[in-house]
Amino acid sequence: MNPRQLEQMARQMQKEMMRIQEELANATVEGTAGSYITVTMNGHREIKSIKIAPEVVDPDDIETLQDLIVAAITDASKKAQELAEQRLGPLAGGMKLPGF
């Protein structure tokens, strides 16, 4: 493969990477903790919304609410990571991508 072909391949990969990054920014995943907490985030792991069921809000038990929120965020983050790995996997040739 000559240098010109390598350069062209690199440009194509960069263009595809940018397209996938935009796709991830627009994609959403939901993480849940039971039916009480739902966290929505995009493929870049940016939280877009948190929904809390009123029945889980107990002023005398804030710790449970906090634990549920953490669990829902962790679930959503894991799903966002899986989505990114799925979309970016073909470009990485099966390598684990740092930060995803």
Curated annotation (Swiss-Prot):
A cellular-component GO term for this protein: cytosol
Main subcellular location of this protein, as a coarse class: cytoplasm
Subcellular location: Cytoplasm, Nucleoid
Recorded superkingdom: Bacteria
Keyword vocabulary terms for this entry: Cytoplasm, DNA-binding
Gene Ontology molecular function terms on file: DNA binding
Family annotation (Pfam families): YbaB_DNA_bd
Function per UniProt: Binds to DNA and alters its conformation. May be involved in regulation of gene expression, nucleoid organization and DNA protection.
Family designation: Belongs to the YbaB/EbfC family.
Quaternary structure (record): Homodimer.
Record-given protein name: Nucleoid-associated protein Rcas_2292
UniProt organism field: Roseiflexus castenholzii (strain DSM 13941 / HLO8)
